[in-house]
A protein has these predicted regions:
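Polytopic transmembrane helical bundles with strong interfacial aromatic enrichment
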Residues: 1-286
Length: 286
């Protein structure tokens, strides 16, 4: 169930991000922000992104994409408790890594989810969010430090998984605390014929984009159990960080390409990270 719901959530994220990039926005209209055409299963589809809300009768039947995210998170947490927390003494604790009781290991795991979310949410709500470069440097540095710290507390496999748990929790938090509430406030304003606060749409879109960039790394971590030579590597935290850079830059490259912006310099960052990754894996063997 967790994998199925995750597929649906990721599919939604990719679809709407793709549509936003592909819509023709050079339209002179007071109501239409962008439009485009698609073809699927033998039919043409017209897509229109509106500047203002649709008629009230349409608002009452809006399709809001939220349950994919909610169910992915709920099923993931259930699996976390049933498989890992219940068997924490075996799956989470390694006395060679750190002398810690299973109870403390579980508490640290739970606290890490809340702590990372609070820090990330604070950064998003601060003026720092206006400086993309600085925001990226700080969040990636935080990810690197978190990955390193977790490998010094938990078993290698659970440390890897914990990074995915943290990112997945952030993605859910974005949907549950920002995206959906903002959308509901926009709908309420529309139903009352009040002016829509554009900052609500911008904040929701911003968090949605963050989720989009996190997706590849979370999916990689979900599958990392199949790559023991990476998970149990001496420098697994650095390997994970290299993958984070490669996957994020790849996502950014294709997002720009969807808007017909070709920036090959982004690929240079990916290539450097890939060379660094290969060096770690093949020179410093487990």
């Amino acid at each position: 169930g967790h994998v199925l719901f995750a597929i649906l959530w990721v599919g939604n994220s990719f679809l709407f991000n793709y549509l936003d990039n592909k819509l023709n926005k050079s339209i002179s209209s007071s109501t239409i922000d962008g439009e485009g055409y698609l073809m699927h299963s033998g039919y043409f589809y017209k897509l229109t992104r509106l500047k203002k809300s649709p008629p009230t009768n349409y608002l009452k039947n809006l399709v809001i994409f939220k349950w994919q995210s909610y169910l992915t998170f709920v099923t993931g947490i259930l699996l976390l408790f049933v498989i890992y927390y219940y068997n924490s003494g075996i799956l989470m604790v390694n006395k060679k890594v750190l002398e810690i009781s299973p109870v403390y290991a579980v508490l640290i795991s739970i606290l890490s989810l809340f702590f990372y979310w609070l820090v990330y949410d604070f950064l998003c709500k601060s003026s720092l969010i206006k400086n993309n470069v600085l925001f990226i440097i700080i969040t990636f540095s935080l990810l690197l430090l978190t990955s390193f710290g977790l490998t010094k507390i938990f078993t290698p496999k659970f440390a890897f998984l914990s990074v995915g748990l943290i990112l997945g929790t952030n993605m859910f938090g974005n949907v549950f605390t920002v995206i959906i509430p903002n959308q509901m406030n926009i709908i309420k304003s529309s139903l009352k014929n009040k002016k829509i606060d554009s900052s609500l749409s911008l904040a929701a879109k911003q968090r949605s984009i963050h989720n989009n960039y996190s997706t590849f790394l979370v999916l990689f971590i979900m599958l990392s159990g199949h790559y023991s030579f990476i998970v149990y590597h001496k420098y697994n935290w650095l390997i994970l960080f290299a993958f984070a850079i490669i996957l994020a830059t790849a996502r950014h490259y294709f997002n720009l390409r969807g808007r017909k912006i070709i920036n090959n310099s982004i690929l240079i960052i990916s290539i450097i990270a890939f060379i660094f990754l290969a060096f770690l894996i093949f020179v410093f063997k487990p």
